[in-house]
Amino acid sequence: MAVFKVFYQHNKEEVIVREHTQTIYVEAQTEEQVRRYLKDRNFNIEFIAKLEGAHLEYEKQSDHFNVEQAE
């Protein structure tokens, strides 16, 4: 399993505004599994980044680091 950081907007009907970008962390095997896990939410996904090594350790230090488990 890997941890992915998902950058998204809350409403897929609206134009993307960088200042409104939100993030969530999802543990999954692939990016495709992350997309399937989030498909029922009304998110406009901008980008999905796989976190590894030093980048993952850095993100873990954030107060907002809360990982959801993809099913």
UniProtKB/Swiss-Prot annotation:
Catalytic activity: RNA(n) + a ribonucleoside 5'-triphosphate = RNA(n+1) + diphosphate
EC number: 2.7.7.6
InterPro entries found in the cross-reference section: RpoY (IPR009907)
Keyword Cell membrane applies: no
Domain of life where this protein originates: Bacteria
Key words of the record: DNA-directed RNA polymerase, Nucleotidyltransferase, Transcription, Transferase
GO cellular component: DNA-directed RNA polymerase complex
GO biological process: DNA-templated transcription
Pfam families per UniProt: RpoY
KW Chaperone (keyword) present: no
Entry GO MF terms: DNA binding; DNA-directed RNA polymerase activity
EC class of the enzyme, as a word: transferase
Family that this chain belongs to: Belongs to the RNA polymerase subunit epsilon family.
Function as written in the Swiss-Prot or TrEMBL entry: A non-essential component of RNA polymerase (RNAP).
NCBIfam families documented for this protein: PRK13667.1
Quaternary structure, from the entry: RNAP is composed of a core of 2 alpha, a beta and a beta' subunit. The core is associated with a delta subunit, and at least one of epsilon or omega. When a sigma factor is associated with the core the holoenzyme is formed, which can initiate transcription.
Name recorded for this polypeptide: DNA-directed RNA polymerase subunit epsilon
Record organism: Staphylococcus saprophyticus subsp. saprophyticus (strain ATCC 15305 / DSM 20229 / NCIMB 8711 / NCTC 7292 / S-41)
Name of the coding gene: rpoY
